[in-house]
């Protein structure tokens, strides 16, 4: 009937409006995201992490390999990383012709111990198939970005770190990650922002060509 047809049309219009509102919100989340370097002491609830992991697991993935894995690094596990953190700090200072000070070592330790949440992110390795590994790495980065954006949508900041500690052999050993099966692509540091950088992005017109 005309009445039922009109009602169905109204429902469809409301759905379209809802989708439009959602997409506008998503656009703002994408555009407003910033890398956070200073976190507050506010605790990040694990329920927030679970929502982010759910978003991460819905990333696009060619061939359905789902190569990503996330390790939430607790305090005791972080403490196991500290000898390597200090060693890397000293080597970095030596490469500059300096001697590592107690202050520089303390800063390096703080970057590991004082962050509310640290997540080690890995991608699956496929020995003998470089192209598969390349595709899986790309998929894992998409997954990681889903995680970051999900957190940002709820006011939680993050920083993707690829420092030397993320690639060191001892990190694999201390975190129980197999070097032959997985590659650590970085640590994601997570927490509520103490401050948000006013970072200026490149003009989008400079990164696009229509052929």
Labelled PLM ranges:
Residues 171-183:
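Short, electropositive alpha-helical surface patch
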Residues 4, 45, 136-140:
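Short, conserved glycine- and acidic-residue-centered signature motifs
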Residues 56, 119, 125-173:
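Small-aliphatic-rich amphipathic alpha-helix that forms the alpha element of a beta-alpha
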Residues 1-15:
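Single conserved hydrophobic/aromatic residue that forms the stacking wall/gate
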Residues 75-77, 124-125, 191-195:
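Short loop segments at secondary-structure junctions
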Residues 19-114, 211:
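N-terminal amphipathic, basic helical "cap/leader" segment at the start of enzyme domains
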